[in-house]
Amino acid sequence: MAIYERIGKGYDLTRRADPYIVSRLNHYLKVRANLSYLDVACGTGNYTLALSQSGGTWHGIDQSPRMIGAARKKSDAIFWQLADVTRLPYRERAFSGVVCTLAIHYFIPLSSAFNEIYRVMAAGNFVLFTSTPEQMNGYWLAEYFPEALHQAAEQMPSLEVVNDALSGAGFHSMQTENYSVQEDLQDLFLYSGKHRPAMYMDAAVRAGISTFSLLASTTEIEDGCGKLDSDIKTGRIKDVIRKYEHDEGDYKLIIARKDAT
């Protein structure tokens, strides 16, 4: 995840905790005031801060010094740590819940990360917000940035792979909830412009999205933006968006349980 050193600068210009996503994470975490919680791959701490408003003692870890540095400037009420998810600096059963948003595709191997998260959890839920390759293949962005979207989808572990790694670590009772991007989404991650295609014409927005800043070539961005701009002006974009409509959600909440031992 040290690759986020490359996009950390200016990250908070377009990335912020979305209230609806926070509400769904809270729903499954079931935060209690006297317990401790961990945000894994917390980035600049946007979701950590938002979730901490519900109570509890919060910790956030990230592998990027730039991201953790930005998080530390936002709050000294949260315990921020520069750390690798496969070697967490905590004792066993330290946390009553763990959350991770849009980061598990950087956990290599996935099993090592989930084993560590299981180790530091007491009874509680591990709540993930992610997308699957199947969902990403349904993004209309593939019409304009096919190679970058293909690479991004290939990075994502399938739901089957995630569930196998979770059960292998000891978690059980896995459940999922699909999330479809809404027009008022405040966190400008990859498919946040689903209903607002002109958003992708903004270089600042693209800079905060790893698919564009880390995977897409300059030529693909220039060509894709040119085609997208033309389709927005002619109205063809509406037909493109309709072609990619589906009911499988754009992202997914995955919830796994650990019982008291």
Language model features by range: what are they?
Residues 111-124:
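A short glycine-rich, Lys/Arg-flanked "PGG" loop and its adjoining helix->strand segment in the class I
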Residues 99:
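A conserved beta-strand element that flanks and buttresses the S-adenosyl-L-methionine
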Residues 175-261:
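Conserved Class I S-adenosyl-L-methionine
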Residues 38-40, 44-87:
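Class I SAM-dependent methyltransferase SAM/SAH-binding core
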